[in-house]
Amino acid sequence: DKSGKLIRPENAMQDNFKKPATLFSGGGGLVTTVEDYSRFAQMLLNGGELEGVRILQEPTVKMMMSDQLPEGVVYEETGGYGLGGSYNTQNGQYGWSGAASTFFTVDTENDMVVLAFTQFMPFDIGYALEFNKNVHRAIVE
């Protein structure tokens, strides 16, 4: 508000998640915490295992995180597309973004995950791509 105090807007989008789904859209409407999302990303980085528990088989994770598009077909944003996310054919990173400008990427080459979470609508991924670039520049280069 004008005094700098956080307030919940009327008709907040979170109310939509309490209603029964009328359209099933894969990950559409998926709600989680940053902590759980980071654990999910870490599980993918670990090849399907988290804290000693096997969640997915390693070949499944490798298939998920590799380009599945036929030769000659390119996903405009990153060049490739895995099973449930984009695959960057330039740097081998796998990830996805969400409606409220959320972003995650798994970088197996550099053994790291990067998450950038805002709750900004309409969707704008530009900040997250720049953030990812700066994180890699600071840590890897």
Model-identified regions with their sequence ranges:
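Short, surface-exposed loop or secondary-structure junction motifs
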Residues: 1-89
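Residue-level recognition of short loop/turn positions
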Residues: 3, 109-110
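Solvent-exposed loop/turn segments at secondary-structure junctions
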Residues: 30, 120-123
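Short, surface-exposed charged micro-motifs
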Residues: 84, 103-105
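Short, structured beta-strand/loop micro-motifs enriched in basic residues and often containing a Trp
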Residues: 95
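Short, small/polar residue-rich loop motifs at catalytic or cofactor-binding pockets
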Residues: 98-100
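Short, well-ordered beta-strand elements
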Residues: 105, 111-120
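A short, polar/charged loop-to-alpha-helix boundary motif
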Residues: 124-134
